[in-house]
Regions:
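N-terminal cationic and glycine-rich segments that engage phosphates or anionic surfaces
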Residues: 1-445
C-alpha cells in the first residue's frame, strides 16, 4: 500500500523544521498583535462597533487589510501593507523610469536586492502617513474624544504623540522582519503572505460570533454566508487555475560529427489571473486614500473645505453606489495595468529567443512578445471582470439582503483571494520540496 504524500512531509526533517519554524513565527506574530498602542482610549474602540459614520466604515475596510489588528488599535495596526504598497509603487515605476528597468534587467539578482532595500526605505514614510491617517479616523468616532490620550502635535502632547506613531511604525517593521524570517528559513517566499493570511483567518471565529448574535435570523444569514463562502472559494480556485498554453517549437541542434539532434515542442503557460489579489489591494488603497486625506479637514473652520472633506469621506468610505462602481472600475483597470507591467518585465520574446524557442509563425524577439501580449490581454479580460465582481460582491449581497455589506461574508472578498492564493502557493511549495526528494505525487489529486 502506497503511503500518503502528507506522511512524507512530516517524515522529512528539512520540511518538518521549516513548517515548525513558520508556525512558531506566526504564533509570535499573533501574540504581538494583541498588544495595544500605549495610552489608547478603550471608549473609542468600543464605540467603533456601533459606529455608522464614514470614518467607521473606512476603518472597517482598512481593518480587513490589516488582518483585524486595526480594530483593536494594536501596535501592528498597519500590518505589512505599507511594505506591500511600497513594493507595488516601485514595480509600477519600473517601466516609467528607464534606470530602474535597466537595473532589474541587466543584473536580476542585484536588481532584486536593490528593490528590497528601497522597498524597505519607502515603507517607513508610508507607515508614518498611514499611522497619522488612522489616528485621525479614530478621532472622528466620538466627537471631542481622541483615541490616544495626550494627542496633539504641539506643546506637551508632541512627545507622547510622536512616541505612539513611532511605536506603530516599529510594529510594522517587526511584522515585515518576521515575514522575512519565514521567507528565508521557513516556507520560502511566502513570509509576508502568511503574515496577512494568519491575520485574516484569525477573524473567522469573530465573524461567526457576529453572525450568530444577529437576532433571530442568525441561522438564515449563517447558511447564506457558508454557501457564499464555498461558492466563492470554488470560483476563485477555478479562475486561479485558468491557463492558456501557447505552443513553442525548439529547433534541432547540430552536434558535430554525430549529426543533428532533432527538435521538439513544449508549451508556455499564460495564466488568466497572473497577478493574484494585488489589483484589489492597490485599488482599495487608492480609493481609501482621498478619505484618509479628507479626515484632516473634516473639522476645518472654513465651511467649503469642511463640506468638501465630508463629501469625499462619505463617498470614498464604502457602501454607496459611487464607491462600488468606482471600486469595480479600479480593480479591472489595475488588473490590466499590473498584468501589463509584469508581462513587460518578464520579456518573454527576448528570453525565448535566447533559449532558441520560437512560436510557430512568429519571428523571434519583438514580434513574439507582441503576439504573446495580445493573447495575455484577451485572457485577462474575464479574469479582470471576475476580480471586480468578487471585490464588490459583499456590497451587492448587502443591498439584496438589506444587511451590512460585511455581515453576509465570513471573510471579505480580498481576504478570500489572499487565503486561497496563499494555500495554493503553500501546496505548490510542498510539492516542489517533495519532488526534490524523489516523491512526484500530488498532495491534492
Amino acid at each position: 500500500m502506497k503511503r500518503s504524500p502528507w506522511r512524507y512531509i512530516w517524515k522529512s526533517e528539512g520540511i518538518r523544521n521549516r513548517l515548525l519554524l513558520t508556525l512558531g513565527i506566526l504564533v509570535i506574530y499573533r501574540l504581538i498583535a494583541n498588544i495595544p498602542v500605549p495610552g489608547f482610549n478603550a471608549q473609542v474602540i468600543a464605540a467603533l462597533n456601533s459606529s455608522r459614520s464614514a470614518a467607521g466604515d473606512l476603518i472597517n475596510i482598512l481593518n480587513v487589510l490589516s488582518g483585524g489588528t486595526l480594530s483593536s488599535f494594536s501596535i501592528l495596526a498597519m500590518g505589512v501593507y505599507p511594505y506591500i504598497t511600497a513594493s507595488i509603487i516601485l514595480q509600477l515605476l519600473g517601466p516609467i523610469i528607464p534606470s530602474i528597468q535597466d537595473k532589474l534587467k541587466n543584473d536580476p539578482k542585484e536588481g532584486r536586492k536593490w528593490m528590497e532595500k528601497w522597498t524597505m526605505y519607502l515603507s517607513i514614510p508610508l507607515a508614518f502617513l498611514s499611522a497619522i491617517g488612522q489616528i485621525g479616523l479614530f478621532n472622528q468616532i466620538l466627537p471631542g474624544i481622541t483615541v490616544l490620550k495626550n494627542y496633539g502635535w504641539s506643546g506637551s502632547n508632541l512627545l507622547p504623540t510622536l512616541a505612539n506613531v513611532l511605536t506603530m511604525i516599529a510594529g510594522t517593521m517587526i511584522a515585515i522582519w518576521l515575514g522575512q524570517i519565514i521567507s528565508e528559513y521557513g516556507i520560502q517566499q511566502q513570509g509576508l503572505s502568511l503574515i496577512i493570511f494568519s491575520g485574516i483567518v484569525s477573524q473567522l471565529p469573530a465573524n461567526v460570533v457576529r453572525i450568530l448574535s444577529d437576532g433571530s435570523s442568525w441561522w438564515y444569514i449563517l447558511l447564506i454566508s457558508i454557501i457564499i463562502f464555498l461558492v466563492s472559494i470554488f470560483a476563485i480556485v477555478y479562475l486561479q487555475q485558468g491557463t492558456r498554453y501557447v505552443k513553442l517549437m525548439i529547433p534541432g541542434q547540430r552536434l558535430g560529427y554525430r549529426g543533428v539532434k532533432s527538435g521538439g515542442s513544449t508549451t508556455l503557460p499564460l495564466r488568466v489571473n497572473s497577478v493574484g489579489m494585488i489589483p484589489l489591494i492597490f485599488a482599495q488603497s487608492l480609493i481609501t486614500f482621498p478619505a484618509l486625506i479628507a479626515s484632516f479637514f473634516v473639522n476645518s473652520s472654513t465651511p467649503w473645505v469642511a463640506n468638501t472633506a465630508t463629501w469625499i469621506q462619505n463617498h470614498f468610505s464604502g457602501g454607496g453606489a459611487f464607491y462600488v462602481i468606482l471600486y469595480f472600475i479600479l480593480v479591472v483597470a489595475f488588473t490590466f495595468f499590473y498584468t501589463s507591467v509584469t508581462f513587460m518585465n518578464n520579456d518573454y520574446g527576448e528570453n525565448l529567443k535566447k533559449q532558441g524557442a520560437v512560436v510557430p509563425g512568429r519571428a523571434a524577439g519583438t514580434d513574439t512578445q507582441n503576439y504573446l501580449a495580445k493573447i495575455q490581454d484577451r485572457i485577462t479580460l474575464p479574469g479582470a471582470v471576475f476580480l471586480g465582481l468578487i471585490a464588490i460582491l459583499p456590497y451587492i449581497l448587502g443591498a439584496i439582503l438589506r444587511t451590512n455589506a460585511n455581515s453576509t461574508m465570513l471573510l471579505s472578498s480580498s481576504g478570500l483571494l489572499i487565503v486561497v492564493g496563499c494555500v495554493r502557493d503553500i501546496i505548490d511549495y510542498l510539492e516542489s520540496e517533495l519532488n526534490q526528494r524523489g516523491y512526484d505525487e500530488k498532495l491534492i489529486r
